[in-house]
């Protein structure tokens, strides 16, 4: 998984206070700028950030695992520093299991949605997405 993410993401230490800790923390920062006549006159700058936390579950994924990761990511999003250049941040929690994932767990993860606007969206927004990966049958649930 690390090899696939290497092209677009930088790997960093996970943020402090995450419990459970992700096995891998990947960050992608993208900046878009519009200039007028030369690069010294910038009309606007926007930042789009993406964060991916990969969790390897040794046994079956449980509802408590999803709830714990959801609460941690909610806290991270709430503490996200934003400025006038921030446009969007997407947080993805990927839980990977060698055991088959129950349909009830997939429904629980699908129901977990979180969106936060900063300053009525004037300083951007942040979204949380869950991905459950079932290695036993080779399927990803989004």
Feature-to-residue mapping (PLM):
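Short secondary-structure capping micro-motifs at structural edges
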Residues: 39-42, 73-83
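Active-site-adjacent loop/helix micro-motif of nuclease/hydrolase catalytic cores
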Residues: 60-78, 102-107
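Histidine- and/or cysteine-centered catalytic micro-motif in compact active-site loops
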Residues: 56-59, 96
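The transition from N-terminal targeting/processing segments to the mature protein
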Residues: 22-27, 91, 121, 131
